[in-house]
Design a protein with these regions (language model features):
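Conserved acidic residues
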Residues: 66, 125, 155
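Short amphipathic alpha-helix with an adjacent loop that forms part of the alpha/beta core around
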Residues: 59-61, 115-121, 189
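PRPP-dependent phosphoribosyltransferase catalytic core
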Residues: 2-9, 144-214
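Hydrophobic Val/Ile/Leu positions in short beta-strands of Rossmann-like dinucleotide-binding domains
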Residues: 70, 129-130
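Short, well-ordered alpha-helices that flank and scaffold nucleotide-derived cofactor binding pockets
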Residues: 57, 83, 87, 145, ...
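Short glycine-rich phosphate-binding loop at a beta-alpha junction
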Residues: 63-74
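Short, glycine/charge-rich flexible loops or terminal/linker lids adjacent to PRPP-binding catalytic cores
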Residues: 78-128, 135-139
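Active-site-facing substrate-recognition patch
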Residues: 1-64, 207-214
Length: 214
């Protein structure tokens, strides 16, 4: 992707910004008219901290979070969020009074599993799901099912960008939402209005980034 095609959306909070490109893009489950580039938020410490601080503002000090499950390569943000939660005296039930930060393992069928040595950080714990985005909900659903299966409790869902404020009965909070992106839309591939107009796909996107098609 050419950097000149990227638009930066700034906010009042230092280092809290969003980089986007308008166009016609395909994910594994939908077609979207914005590519949201979260590379820097996931890898640059200053921006990861800004996302963590923004997400923290949505939670009450009575929120209990024992474990943060990081999806979509969100480990740096998850670590920053754990630090913010700990330094702001949020409750957790862990005997060591700190927070687990985990990344899931996926089977070949994209199912989330936890090995025996990781299960103690899930079973009986209040687990916050942290994703890059919550749009179709497929990734969040897989995490919810895994946490429940292994005996954990979902404490909520957080993301850099989300199109919903509730998913499967769990609160979703995000640093950015469609109000920040004029005309944002997401459609099932067979219902995509851009495809029906004959607009060519510009690229494939996933949690790793963007692959240009032409």
């Amino acid at each position: 992707m050419q950097s000149e095609n990227i638009t930066t959306i700034s906010t009042k909070r230092k280092n809290l910004l969003l980089r986007v490109q308008k166009g016609h893009f395909a994910t594994s489950h939908s077609h979207i008219n914005y590519f949201i580039d979260v590379t820097m938020q996931k890898s640059r410490l200053s921006e990861a901290k800004a996302i963590a601080e923004e997400l923290l503002s949505y939670y009450q000090s009575t929120t209990i979070i024992d474990t943060i499950l990081c999806l979509d390569g969100m480990q740096v943000v998850g670590t920053c969020l754990a630090e913010e939660l700990t330094s702001n005296n949020f409750m957790n039930l862990n005997s060591h009074k700190t927070i687990y930060v985990l990344t899931p393992e996926h089977t070949s069928g994209s199912q989330i599993i936890f090995r025996d040595n990781i299960i103690p950080a899930i079973a009986g714990k209040n687990v916050l799901i942290l994703a890059a985005s919550v749009v179709t909900g497929y990734t969040a659903k897989s995490a919810i099912e895994a946490i429940t299966y292994y005996g954990g409790r979902v404490a909520g869902i957080s993301g850099i960008f989300a199109t919903v404020d509730n998913y499967m009965g769990y609160e979703v909070v995000s640093a950015f939402d469609p109000n920040d992106l004029p005309g944002y839309s997401s459609h099932a591939p067979l219902e995509c209005p851009m495809c029906k107009r004959g607009q060519r796909l510009e690229g494939l996107v996933n949690s790793f980034g963007f692959s240009k098609l032409y």
